[in-house]
Amino acid sequence: MYGTWFTTGKVTDLLARTGLDRVPVWVPVVLGVVLMAFVGSVRIDPALQGWVSVGTVTLLLVLNRRRGRGITVFLMMLSLLVSLRYIVWRLTATVQFSNWLQTALAVLLLLAEAYALMTLCLSYFQMAWPLRRREHPLPEDMAQWPSVDVFVPSYNEELSLVRSTVLGALDLDWPADRLNVYILDDGRRKAFHDFAVEAGAGYIIRAENNHAKAGNLNHALAVTDSPFAVIFDCDHVPTRGFLRRTIGWMMADPNLALLQTPHHFYAPDPFQRNLAGGMHVPPEGNMFYGLVQDGNDFWDATFFCGSCAIIRREAVMGIGGFATETVTEDAHTALKMQRRGWGTAYLREPLAAGLATERLILHIGQRVRWARGMIQIMRLDNPMLGAGLRWEQRLCYLSAMSHFLFAIPRLTFLVSPLAFLFLGQNIIAASPLAISVYALPHIFHSVITLSRIEGRWRYSFWSEIYETSLALFLVRITIVTLLQPHKGKFNVTDKGGLLARGYFDWDAVYPNVILAGVLCAALLRGVFGIVWQFHDRLALQSFILNTLWVVISLIIVLASIAVGRETRQTRNAPRVSVRLPVVVTDAHGRQMEGHTHDISLGGLAVGTRLATPDMVGGEVTVRYDSARDGIHVGVPARVLDARDGTLRLRWAVRDLEDERQVVSMVFGRNDAWAGWADFAPDRPLRSLAMVFRSIGGLLRRRPAEAPRALHEMGEGELPATEEKLEKQSFVLKPVPRSARHGATASAALFVAFTALVPAAMAQEAPSPDQSGVTAETPFGDSNTGVVPDALPAIDPAVADRISDAEVTRTLTFRNLGATTGPLTLRGYSPLQGLDVVVPANRVVTHAQLTLSGALSPSLLPEASAVTVTLNEQYVGTLKVDPQHPQFGPVSFDIDPLYFTGDNKLNFHFAGEYRRDCNDLFNEILWARISDMSRITLTTVRITPERKLSRLPAPFFDPNQRSTLRVPVVLPATGDRGALRAAGLVASWFGRIADFRKLSFPVSTTIPASGNAVEVGVNLPVDAEGGRPAGPMLAEVANPNDRWGTVLVVTGRTAQEVEVAARALVFSPDTLGGVASKVVSDVSLETRHPYDAPAFVPTDRPVRFGELVGAADLQGGGFAPAGMTLPFHLPPDLYTWRGRPFLMNMWVRAPGGPVVDLETSRVDVSLNNNYLQSYTLSPPGLWRKWSERLVNQHAGAVGHVTALPPWLLFGQNQLQFNFDARPIDRGACRRTPGDIHMSVDSDSTLDFRRGYHFAEMPNLSYFAEAAFPFSRMADLSETTVVLPDHPDTGTTGAFLDLMGFFGASTWYPAAGVTVMGADEVAHTPPKGDIVVLGTAAQLGGAASGLLARSPYVIHDRHITVGQRMGLQGIWYLFQDHDHAGLKDGVTANLNAPIAEAGVLLAAQSPYDSQRSVVAFTGDTPERIHDLVLSLRNKGDLPSLQGDLVLKNGDRFTSYRTAPVYTVGSLPLWLRLDWFLGHHPSALYLAGLAGAGLAALGVWAWLRGWSRKRIARDDLTGEL
């Protein structure tokens, strides 16, 4: 419940008032996440995405100025939403797999980006709500305070480094009888032993150095007994209040196994020291200890970091001691304890301080060990697996482990632009606009949100520098450790080193120097490509984008190289800036009060007005007293310098007590490191400026350094050769503070040595397995294609001539279909042919073929020729003349008996260029037949045979490719029944004609010549004028032309006329061999949406064999003529995110040693757009034999091809082009040329993933497939509105339109409703509406039917209506077409309708899901001409938008009306579409999702914080 967690604040009050505080917290989280996921997956146009991005960025900048955890959580959700949109865009719109190299590079980059996004999510999860735990008070009764063992492990560190830590630990503010400080010396050095005796500390060594530091600690646990153990690395000096400020939590919570505190480093790390702007940037480790660990504490997933931590002995012993399986024993130990149910905690207060790694190479070595250890944990004891952890803890560990996998992704980001600049592989296929509106907001939100979260702990862009400095070193370690997790050993990190002078550390940066050189070369390549190479726009954009990418990578790499410029380090003891009140007393007893500027273990600087030069060389006493911290210092010092009011002093330490006091003053103060986070809040631009400043420091010459001697070795430092103790288990108990002097110490030492060693040896745990472990094992600090032009029409004047005399026509090959140029024959493609059509009502009496062209002059005349055949009958031979390669014109007479209706004129080439052997693919094997060659045919008409069984002949000839004319006689053009019947017959002819041009000129009388169809009531059915006895069909001679035939469709009533028409179109096979017949009505099945026979079914896979014959999918020769598969689709198929449809294609190629299947291929194209090429290579042997058992395609090669929806139209064509190569090409062996290849007719097309949904108005849908009228095959949901008294021109346009519908659906228009314009006012039309007629003919009906159109036709002009014009601002928010169409509003449309046709589409005023398409113009002839444009393939691309004006042969298209939709989608897909077209709604939905998720997460986090720490005084702001 919300009420459980919200106690204050406006949000709490609002929720309480509305009752929402009783809603479970997971409800808004789930709703918000689902909404964010949905919004993140919606695809929109890049321009619209730009506005969404502007909105999110603006909101980010506004909210980022306000404080509060709730706003931070919301900004994280907003950032994740923007990042989600980016990654979905990357995965769905920018990836191309053109070849294996591009695929590999693109996938690698995608994996790197997925890693980055996962890291971002985990970072938000960890840092969303830092717990900000405060110290827990101790019991007032000190008798209840527990005993504590303090362990200071060491191996090979210098004693000078360890002394301070031990002295600081001995000075801890804790009861002396309950404080035991031990040096755990795995180096067994006598000097350490002697120091422990002198200081009163305990000293423990062991016989073998098994498992390095972890083994050392385990041994110490075995020989000590305090309930708590505190561990300090040998350079981590604690403050005096360390135990008082930490033990309270361990006592308050018995289940707490670990309390970790920060590792603070008082010396600068390599990045701070070496970079020009480094000292103004937070240390590299601050983010982990200042933010990440605090976030881990929130989830009870604090990591043990090996030092500055309190461990409960019971907990660590319960897991068998400190983990020894990995080189990061600390984190692994915490993981094991958490698996057992122990809790962990973190106190974000630096209570100890140590030395950072002095040099970059040492820093790299330390991080390499950490990376190896975390990857070992991932491989050996993966927190994501196994029992014992909550999911929150698993995610925290996943974040830690995955962080050290950054090397490969970081390197991938740096070098990805090289893929294009060097290899020519474009691995992000996107425009600059798309990248700008998707990638840049993703980066911007991530940077700004992380900047807000990380604030003073980590500055923007510096993580990139830190990671780049390590990446190339970690790549190998990452791979090796993943593959061999047991490999690798514990390495100690050297600290406290000195540098006499600065130098450039090539060993630490040489990989990045090499990388920088490669990037510089890439930069030069990019500049060269941009400036000196000429490219198309896309290539130029790619060059610019990748060059900019290289520049960014180069900046990061140069900054990482700058870290390698090591600065001089000549101080053993780094200075700490602090202002402390001190009193300086000189040798004369004069006291000077002042404040320190800085202090160190070596000395200090004091500001005092009494400093004089004569004090230099003298000795003074420095006193510092702090009652709060219990520190009282009085230590002598020597004056090194005294000027400008500042004394520079060096400590003159006399004994161990003086050293202890110095350590206490420098490190023991409770607030010593309170300013560890005193950095200005991050500002990304300022941070970026610091990066450039650091790069400038790399390029700037360093001034000469004056030589400075290194600090001489002090008496406490080790000599060159150390004296070692014997390998044995030895325990020296610490001496209480009261006994740390003189004889008492000696006695204690003796007792410890003689009495405790046996006890220690008795307590020592059995030695673990030591295989592979030696005494030298180190340890240290842990951590639709273009439609071709139609064939030229034969001159109608010639075609329509009617005469008993012979008619001679000459057709060029171009007229016959050779529209692409000459017929070219080659050795591998020796056969070419053309169709020669002879009309069915004519017979050839004479024919002559005239050829011209050229034959290769390199051919052998006696062995080369071109053979000409007609219908496989020999016509003639073209012989080779090397001296005259061009031939013609050459004429051949053709026997008229060879001709049928559809004739094949073939040319077969046989050629050789040498006598012994020939290569069919040699370029000199060729012959060309000019496309201006011609065939002359003399024909004569034959007497017509008038039988109904021959229908549709003689009115339709299937062999004709020219425009077909079927004159229609309507004695009464205003008769609605006759119009419906004539429209039905016209649609039948349209179905038969299919793609051929067809027109129906209308007259009221029988034409003077030729054939015609007469439709009407009570028409004569014979030459004597007899009348029909019922619904009747009859073929009679044209009274004006004995060669012509009139098909009479009649009846006694209008209803009988329609019955006769239905019988004609639905059952022509039952009419019989008679000239006339009374017919019966035909019962028709109810049609269903989208069941038009022309449309490919979309509810099941469709076999190729259902669309074409198997012979159409076969070809002969090595390069047979292309095979085509035509198919029709409803144009309203919609898929989610444009997912492609699938074609499952099976290809058969000849086996045996004929074709080189590996190099042979088949090219697949869709509507003349290339899709893919596939090899003809068969499957492997196992697959081949298994397919023989279960697969009908055995022996064929299968491929799945994606058909992009944007390449599919109403009328489509798949093209398959084989290109085979002979297996013995070039050898002196004859290659068979009569091979056959095919596409299996059982191959399938699958459109099942499509939904019927379309955005309207769209005239291209209508022009391509008569949509939306063709939705019902019989047009049963279509109403045609005509003038009340249509003239013949308008009626002809109506019949032509019905023919177009029939050709589009392959089904007669049996259900169309025809009504007059005057009927519209009192009987609104139903369904989709077609309007035909001039504005004058339609009267007021036109304005009513087009009420929702933005256009107004008035006074022979078409304009944008006043209502639409005044709402121009509204159009700014509408969806606009980006196909180059004009907008009527912005184009100020005001076009005269003079000798022009107008095609207009709009939403129906009667039904929002219905459409109106209107054909109008100034004359009926213009309307008729506009309808005929629907049958002209060349005009179809011009019919788009919602308005088309046709003036002569010129089309102008407009899109002005708002979009409406027809069809239906599932709810989720409808929402996806809606949001994809309405960026404002998408933006608001995204904000709503982010807000809901943020609200729920905020409440959940707040409540969880209360569970972790219930008291307000023990935690920070909630």
From Swiss-Prot:
Main location: membrane
Bilayer-spanning residue ranges: 24-44, 71-91, 105-125, 404-424, 427-447, 465-485, 514-534, 543-563, 1481-1501
Matching InterPro entries: Cell_synth_A (IPR003919), Cell_synth_B (IPR003920), Cell_synthase_bac (IPR018513), Cellulose_synth (IPR005150), Glyco_trans_2-like (IPR001173), Glycosyltr_2/OpgH_subfam (IPR050321), Nucleotide-diphossugar_trans (IPR029044), PilZ_domain (IPR009875)
Pathway assigned in UniProt: Glycan metabolism; bacterial cellulose biosynthesis
Chain segments carrying region Catalytic: 1-731
Recorded catalytic activity of this chain's protein: [(1->4)-beta-D-glucosyl](n) + UDP-alpha-D-glucose = [(1->4)-beta-D-glucosyl](n+1) + UDP + H(+)
Compositional bias per record (Polar residues), positions renumbered to this chain: 768-785
EC number(s) reported in the record: 2.4.1.12
GO cellular component, one term: plasma membrane
UniProt KW keywords: Cell inner membrane, Cell membrane, Cellulose biosynthesis, Glycosyltransferase, Membrane, Transferase, Transmembrane, Transmembrane helix
Positions of region (Catalytic subdomain B): 314-374
GO process annotations (BP): cellulose biosynthetic process; UDP-alpha-D-glucose metabolic process
Entries under NCBIfam families matching the protein: CelA (TIGR03030)
Annotated family: In the N-terminal section; belongs to the glycosyltransferase 2 family. In the C-terminal section; belongs to the AcsB/BcsB family.
Stated name of the protein: Putative cellulose synthase 2
Gene symbol of the encoding locus: bcsABII-A
